[in-house]
């Protein structure tokens, strides 16, 4: 079995992008941390032939929803909001409008697009995560992409 540090190094960026797509950039780091804490506990029992990336995306999906629910119950102080976000090595910094457009999609479409195009999961695994059929996952992804294309065309003409 590979050292867990190697798993984090290889799959960490994908997990962060999935967390970001599910709950947004503000809470994504917390969900990422929770994902790898949970994964670390379960990693010794993971079968050798398991798809590690799919396993991590499943955990990330669940932890992101947990973090989002927990944070939605907490008050947010507005006085401490910085004027400008911190610049980090994040692929979203080059395309903030893409992440905003993705966040505007209905939940199942957003998740299907993120899991397929960001995490690279097949529709059968996406269907398990979303609790629907592979055809429904494929349709949600296609509808989400159609909406994203429409939003970008509108932004280009604005």
Model-derived features with residue positions:
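C-terminal flanking helix
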Residues: 16, 36, 106, 110, ...
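A short pre-motif secondary-structure segment
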Residues: 112-116
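Arg/Lys-rich amphipathic alpha helix in sigma70-family domain 2
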Residues: 45-48, 58-79, 91
């Amino acid at each position: 079995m590979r050292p867990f540090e190697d798993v984090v190094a290889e799959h960490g960026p994908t997990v962060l992008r999935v967390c970001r797509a599910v709950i947004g950039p503000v809470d994504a780091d917390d969900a990422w941390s929770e994902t790898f804490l949970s994964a670390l506990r379960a990693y010794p029992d993971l079968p050798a032939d398991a798809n590690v990336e799919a396993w991590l995306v499943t955990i990330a999906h669940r932890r992101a929803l947990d973090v989002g629910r927990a944070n939605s119950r907490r008050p947010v102080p507005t006085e401490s909001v910085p004027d400008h976000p911190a610049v980090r090595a994040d692929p979203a910094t080059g395309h903030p409008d893409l992440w905003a457009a993705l966040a505007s999609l209905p939940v199942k479409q957003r998740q299907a697009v993120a899991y397929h195009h960001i995490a690279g999961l097949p529709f059968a695994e996406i269907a398990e995560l979303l609790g629907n059929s592979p055809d429904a996952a494929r349709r949600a992804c296609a509808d989400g992409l159609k909406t994203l294309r429409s939003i970008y065309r509108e932004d280009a003409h604005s």
